[in-house]
Amino acid sequence: MSNGIFIVGTDTDIGKTFVTGGILYLLRKNGVNASYFKAALSGAIKVNERLIPGDTKFVSDLSGLNEEYSFLTPYVFETAVSPHLASKIENIPINLEVIKSSYLKVKEKYDYIVAEGSGGIVCPMVHNEKSTILLEDIIKLLDLDTLLVASAGLGSINHTVLTVKYIENAGLNIKGIIVNGYDENNICHRDNVKMIKKLTSKDIIALIPRIKDNNNHKEIKKVFDDLDYKKIKKCIGA
């Protein structure tokens, strides 16, 4: 496997970008020459006729990564739908060779890559008459292990166990699970963590509390500073 990790979520809006940014912040703070990569992003915001990929901007700002967004994210779409559909609507075909070459350029410059997926593991990236490419195929293309981000709330046991089984059946390796939005005082959250660990046999490497304001970088950094950095670093092989 290449020197990096691919962050996957049990669903869209589960906290992948938040966790990705936090992990990259920790790595860079502790002297690791690490970067971000996201193959395709939908739902970008247009500012002065320029599309700004929100996830890429958030991760870069939080971690102190200073790169052109296009270097980190080769495909950026304004339409807020799955990449395969945004690609079709905007008439911009997604080319796997472009994704691979873009990733390799980032890899040449940095020692470790924290890559982020789009949506969940079965998110379609390309769909045409010739083929259907899912997020799992992008992970295989980049030859990376995965780290799964799951919710702490109701329904998480089912979503997480199914995602783990799917990832394993796809022949991919899961290094661990991060539970996002966790409240120690919530009996459901505590039991979810216990059952997820039992049913998946995967290490839960971090329990991250809910953040009131995702734009408060000072608060976010404190949350990640309070985590067990050595455990995270060892888990992802950074």
Curated annotation (Swiss-Prot):
One of its GO terms (molecular function) is dethiobiotin synthase activity. It is an enzyme of class 6 (ligase). Keywords: ATP-binding, Biotin biosynthesis, Cytoplasm, Ligase, Magnesium, Metal-binding, Nucleotide-binding. This is ATP-dependent dethiobiotin synthetase BioD. Homodimer. It comes from the Bacteria. It comes from Clostridium novyi (strain NT). Substrate binds at S42. Belongs to the dethiobiotin synthetase family. It holds the Pfam family AAA_26. ATP binds at residues 13-18, 55, 116-119, 209-211, 216. Its EC number is 6.3.3.3. Its main location: cytoplasm. The gene is bioD. Pathway: Cofactor biosynthesis; biotin biosynthesis; biotin from 7,8-diaminononanoate: step 1/2.
